[in-house]
Amino acid sequence: MRAKATRNIHQFSTYFKNFSFREIKKSMLRKIINLGLPSAMQMLFEVALFTAAIWLCGSIGKTSQAANQIALTLATTTFMFAMGLSVTATIRVGNNKGLMDYKNLIIVARSVFLLAIILETIFGILFVILHNFLPHLFLNMENANQVIENKEVIIIASKLLLVAAVFQISDGIQVVVLGALRGLQDVKVPMYITFFA
């Protein structure tokens, strides 16, 4: 174990030869913190909201919590596509801003927004069409002892999926727009909006 740790330290030490903390400029650190902290707070507010929803459902009962977890898992899975587009928007918009190519920046931003709207609309439609079927994928329907509980979970989860279908589109657009704003280095106003929303 020690030999492996020593080998790893030796491998990485080549990257830090002649490194000094004096090389790090305070102005650059300040800029990174001014961009990173509001973005981190933004994500914290969103995660805290979903965590609070799970906690509240847990206090209501296990069937509500199970149904909420099913709907949240499905919504979060489809939300990852929008998160990927958000990263794309951040990179592409930031790149075009750095090149001062504002015409292409607008084209890129609109393209990513449109792609997010199309994808999230498709997911929303699938949630509406399959809202009674999707909860079955998460439950053991062969267990005779849980038939009544499973039916209750399916009823609640199917209703929650209809709600998720609606907020799927707005949530997808919101995260992609925030990614584009991050690319423009505009992070403080979105942080306040996320806090109050």
PLM features: residue spans?
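Short alpha-helical transmembrane segments in multi-pass integral membrane proteins
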Residues: 1-36, 93-167
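Juxtamembrane/interfacial segments around transmembrane helices
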Residues: 12-17, 42-45, 89, 171-174
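Loop-to-helix entry region at the N-terminal start of transmembrane alpha-helices
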Residues: 34-38, 63-72, 159
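Small-residue-rich hydrophobic transmembrane alpha-helices
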Residues: 67-131, 171-185, 189-193
